[in-house]
Every structure is written in C-alpha cells, then in structure tokens.
C-alpha cells in the first residue's frame, strides 16, 4: 500500500522529494524548534490542528526508533552499530526530518506558502540549468500574491471567477426556434 502522508495537506511526497537530502535540518534542530515554538500546543490536551498532530506522531515515532537503536547498540558490535545507525538515519530519519520540516513550516509560514514553495522549487530544479534563474526559491521570501492553479479538483475549493462561455454548438445540435411571423414578413 502506497500511503502519502502529505495528501491531506494538499501536497505530496513527490514534491518533498524534489528538495535535496541536505536541505532538511538536523533532527535535533527540528525537535528543538518544535519544542521552542509549539511546546504548549504539542503537550497540551487540546487538539490544535492536523499539523500539530502530525508533529506529535513524528516525535513519538522518532523517540521509539531511538530507543530501538539504543537497545540494538548495546547488543551489537561497533561495526554493526554503525551500519544500523547509518541505515536508520538515511531512511526513517530522513522521513521524520521531512515530516517535521513540512509541518513546522506549515505552522510557521502557512500551508499555502509551503505548497507554493514546493511547487516553485520543483519547477526550478527540473528546469535545465541554462534556462533557470541562478538562485532557487526561498521559502521565507515567496511573494504573498503567488497563485497556484490546480488541475482538476472540486469547484467549491476554487475562488469565484467569471465563467468562460462554452463553445457554440453546431446548428444541427441546437434546438430549433420558431419565429413568430410579423405582419411585415407576409409581403
């Protein structure tokens, strides 16, 4: 089963994968940032937002994974321990870093701004070097007026806009109208 944990937030795992691996801060820095900015909301009993819930879950997963690594480290050789730690940091650790970065950024800058950044960066990175601007988009400097047009989706989510007239029907498909005859047309 292929589960995309970012789908409900209007983003996708694919968009986050456009960002280079070294883009995401160290896990300790992300955990410290989460604690410094949102400790009350994360430890409180009230449900604040889906982003807070996702951060809580990521922190719990990382804590359990750290316990497992500690237990395994005590019962293995140095070489095996290094291999395990490297593997965890490059797989699960990366996913936790991506998750924490995404949700912390959504809380800090707004979900819409983060989506704009991911799309802008994805376009920038896929554009061949000779045709793209020298500097990549930066999350904190995105203009607020940037508009993302979604493909498909529900019409209720879109802002109201003027309807474009539909193309004209061919005469054979349009209903026939009878003209009332005026007295002048009888001549």
Swiss-Prot record:
Any one of the GO CC terms: T=4 icosahedral viral capsid
Family annotation (SUPFAM superfamilies): Hepatitis B viral capsid (hbcag)
Sequence repeats: 159-165, 166-173, 174-181
Annotated region described as RNA binding, given as residue ranges: 181-187
UniProt KW NAD keyword: no
GO biological process: one example: viral penetration into host nucleus
Region (Disordered): 136-187
Domain of life: Viruses
Keywords, ordered alphabetically: Capsid protein, Cytoplasmic inwards viral transport, DNA-binding, Host cytoplasm, Host-virus interaction, Microtubular inwards viral transport, Phosphoprotein, Repeat, RNA-binding, T=4 icosahedral capsid protein, Viral penetration into host nucleus, Virion, Virus entry into host cell
Phosphoserine: modified positions: 159, 166, 174
One protein family per Pfam: Hepatitis_core
Oligomeric and partner information: Homodimerizes, then multimerizes. Interacts with cytosol exposed regions of viral L glycoprotein present in the reticulum-to-Golgi compartment. Interacts with human FLNB. Phosphorylated form interacts with host importin alpha; this interaction depends on the exposure of the NLS, which itself depends upon genome maturation and/or phosphorylation of the capsid protein. Interacts with host NUP153.
Recorded family membership: Belongs to the orthohepadnavirus core antigen family.
Function of the protein: Self assembles to form an icosahedral capsid. Most capsids appear to be large particles with an icosahedral symmetry of T=4 and consist of 240 copies of capsid protein, though a fraction forms smaller T=3 particles consisting of 180 capsid proteins. Entering capsids are transported along microtubules to the nucleus. Phosphorylation of the capsid is thought to induce exposure of nuclear localization signal in the C-terminal portion of the capsid protein that allows binding to the nuclear pore complex via the importin (karyopherin-) alpha and beta.
Protein name in the entry: Capsid protein
Gene that encodes the chain: C
């Amino acid at each position: 089963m292929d589960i995309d944990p970012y789908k409900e937030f209007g983003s996708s795992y694919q968009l986050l994968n456009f960002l280079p691996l070294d883009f995401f801060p160290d896990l300790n820095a992300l955990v410290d940032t989460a604690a410094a900015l949102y400790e009350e909301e994360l430890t409180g009993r009230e449900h604040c937002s889906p982003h807070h819930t996702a951060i809580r879950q990521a922190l719990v997963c990382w804590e359990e994974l750290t316990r497992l690594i500690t237990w395994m480290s005590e019962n293995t050789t140095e070489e095996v321990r290094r291999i395990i730690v490297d593997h965890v940091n490059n797989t699960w650790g990366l996913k936790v870093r991506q998750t924490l970065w995404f949700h912390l950024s959504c809380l800090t800058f707004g979900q819409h701004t983060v989506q704009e950044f991911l799309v802008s960066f994805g376009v920038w990175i896929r554009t061949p070097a000779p045709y793209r601007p020298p500097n990549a988009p930066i999350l904190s400097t995105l203009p607020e007026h940037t508009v993302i047009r979604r493909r498909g989706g529900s019409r209720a989510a879109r802002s109201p806009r003027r309807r474009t007239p539909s193309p004209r029907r061919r005469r054979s498909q349009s209903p026939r109208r009878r003209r009332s005859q005026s007295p002048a047309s009888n001549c």
